[in-house]
């Protein structure tokens, strides 16, 4: 199940297409198959749940957070909690988090803060910044 979860994570389009509404795979945002620090790595996220989610104003489990990724980040629909997709992804995250302290806010969790720009907003400059820093995860058209 761990390998299946990794497969879903790196090739979501192939293994979970019916739940995805855009062209993304999980690893488009969670780099290096969910292992890279400062790109919301699974090893740091898994041990941080359950946690309050402002998006739905409740305390969610890690599995529920994964379901929300399908709905919000991937513009799709949430797989059922007992679906092999969710079970596989949770199993993979659990394996990556082996040895991590539960409840700790680990260094490298989440994404780094982006500093406020020194210049006022500009559409052309913004398009250039988006192309260089954002399109890899969010696609050419966001």
Where are these regions (language model features)?
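Intrinsically disordered, low-complexity N-terminal regions enriched in serine/proline/glycine
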Residues: 45-48, 91-93, 129
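Sequence/structural segment immediately N-terminal to covalent heme-attachment motifs in c-type
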Residues: 1-35, 117-142
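Gly/Gly-Pro-rich "capping" loops immediately C-terminal to redox-active cysteine motifs
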Residues: 17-67, 141-142
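Short linear functional motifs in flexible/disordered or boundary regions
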Residues: 17, 38-41, 78, 101, ...
């Amino acid at each position: 199940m761990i390998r299946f979860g990794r497969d879903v994570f790196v090739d979501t389009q192939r293994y979970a297409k019916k739940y995805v509404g855009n062209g993304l795979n999980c690893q488009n945002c969670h780099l290096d198959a969910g292992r890279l620090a400062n790109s919301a790595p699974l090893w740091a996220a898994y041990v941080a749940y359950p946690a309050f989610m402002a998006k739905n104003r409740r305390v969610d489990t890690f599995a529920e957070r994964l379901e929300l990724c399908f709905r919000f980040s991937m513009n799709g629909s949430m797989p059922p909690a007992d679906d092999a997709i969710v079970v596989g992804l949770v199993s993979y995250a659990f394996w990556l988090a082996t040895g991590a302290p539960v409840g700790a806010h680990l260094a490298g969790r989440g994404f780094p803060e982006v500093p406020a720009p020194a210049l006022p907003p500009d559409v052309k400059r913004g398009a250039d910044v988006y192309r260089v820093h954002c399109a890899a995860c969010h696609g050419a058209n966001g």
